[in-house]
């Protein structure tokens, strides 16, 4: 059974992330969205809320599970029995970092392969950082995130 682990901070999860998860759910038996605590990134949303938002966005996909984690990714992958890391590549600029990460992960978890997917063209420009910036300035983010995520961002910046 192929179990793919899609790690990220997902602060917040975007339609680009959702697109990759939907496509992965057709390719793999089981997809785990691994939401990283990422305290050094100082996330806008706490881990628990990011996990809940990802669950809401993917609830229509029966073979997708969302789990928060704060350990080393290689250890988490082993705990979950994952045999593939899934990563998205939006542009050539993503490749260099992802290539380094894949090689490091190969050293730490040699039994887990790294697989890269490119997003659908309509989502290739979306990033969580840009979505947060637009939301913070009161812009319309409905094209970039699920309605539940848009509501959470609106509420967060209302404070």
UniProtKB/Swiss-Prot annotation:
Subcellular location: Cytoplasm
Keywords on record: ATP-binding, Coenzyme A biosynthesis, Cytoplasm, Magnesium, Nucleotide-binding, Nucleotidyltransferase, Transferase
GO cellular component, one term: cytoplasm
CDD domains: PPAT
Swiss-Prot/TrEMBL cofactor(s): Mg(2+)
Enzyme Commission numbers on file: 2.7.7.3
Binding, substrate: 9, 41, 73, 87
InterPro entries named among the record's database cross-references: Cyt_trans-like, PPAT, Rossmann-like_a/b/a_fold
Pathway of action: Cofactor biosynthesis; coenzyme A biosynthesis; CoA from (R)-pantothenate: step 4/5
Enzyme class, broadest EC rank: transferase
Biological process terms in GO annotation: coenzyme A biosynthetic process
Subunit structure: Homohexamer.
Family (UniProt): Belongs to the bacterial CoaD family.
Function of the protein: Reversibly transfers an adenylyl group from ATP to 4'-phosphopantetheine, yielding dephospho-CoA (dPCoA) and pyrophosphate.
NCBIfam families per UniProt: coaD_prev_kdtB (TIGR01510), cyt_tran_rel (TIGR00125)
Protein name as catalogued: Phosphopantetheine adenylyltransferase
Species of origin: Pseudomonas entomophila (strain L48)
């Amino acid at each position: 059974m192929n179990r793919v682990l899609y790690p990220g901070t997902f602060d917040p999860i975007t339609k680009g992330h959702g697109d990759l998860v939907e496509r992965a759910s057709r390719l793999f038996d089981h997809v785990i969205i691994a939401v990283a605590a990422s305290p050094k990134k100082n996330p806008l949303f706490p881990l628990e809320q990011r996990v809940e938002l990802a669950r809401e966005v993917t609830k229509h996909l029966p073979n997708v599970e969302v789990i928060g984690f704060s350990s080393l990714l290689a250890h988490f992958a082993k705990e979950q029995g994952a045999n593939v890391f899934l990563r998205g590549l939006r542009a050539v600029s993503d490749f260099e970092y992802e290539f380094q990460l894949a090689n490091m992960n190969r050293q730490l978890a040699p039994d887990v392969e790294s697989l890269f997917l490119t997003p659908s063209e309509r989502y290739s420009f979306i990033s969580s950082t840009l979505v947060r910036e637009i939301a913070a300035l009161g812009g319309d983010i409905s094209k970039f995130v699920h309605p539940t995520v848009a509501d959470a961002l609106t509420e967060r910046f209302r404070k």
